Amino acid sequence: MPTPSMEDYLERIYMLIEEKGYARVSDIAEALEVHPSSVTKMVQKLDKSDYLVYERYRGLVLTAKGNKIGKRLVYRHELLEDFMKIIGVDDTHIYKDVEGIEHHISWDAIDRIGDLVQYFQENQTRIDDLREIQKRNDFPEDE
């Protein structure tokens, strides 16, 4: 199993390849806001763990294993963002909140959150009912 740091890289590499068709060390460094030498070290580690194939100065390609995990990590991230929106988390907090929890939640919990997201998305009335409950439970800022 990849470490949380490896997951961050795999997720970003997968996204870059989906968006651009390729992922260069410089693109990964920019996206993750890290130094290119850090990316090179992690890419070598991911290569050694068979998540990707890396050739210096030529680029990298995800293996079937890396592609499968990358896709699942992106799904997890997007699902958690959807969940946060449904439960009414302010948009300015969603990304940071998802980044804070995505590595600390089991895949079983992700599957159950997926069920819950589906439940709410299938019927807008359910989301509206949740918003009404939230309005009743929210306290004014100055109390």
Curated annotation (Swiss-Prot):
Keywords: Activator, Cytoplasm, DNA-binding, Manganese, Metal-binding, Repressor, Transcription, Transcription regulation. Belongs to the DtxR/MntR family. Residues 1-63 form the HTH dtxR-type domain. Homodimer. One of its GO terms (molecular function) is DNA binding. This is HTH-type transcriptional regulator MntR. GO terms for cellular component: cytoplasm. DNA binding is strongly activated by Mn(2+). InterPro entries: DtxR_MntR_Metal-Reg, Fe_dep_repressor, Fe_dep_repressor_sf, HTH_DTXR, HTH_tscrpt_reg_MntR, Iron_dep_repressor, WH-like_DNA-bd_sf, WH_DNA-bd_sf. The keyword DNA repair does not apply. Pfam families: Fe_dep_repr_C, Fe_dep_repress. The keyword Ion transport does not apply. The gene is mntR. GO terms for biological process: intracellular manganese ion homeostasis.
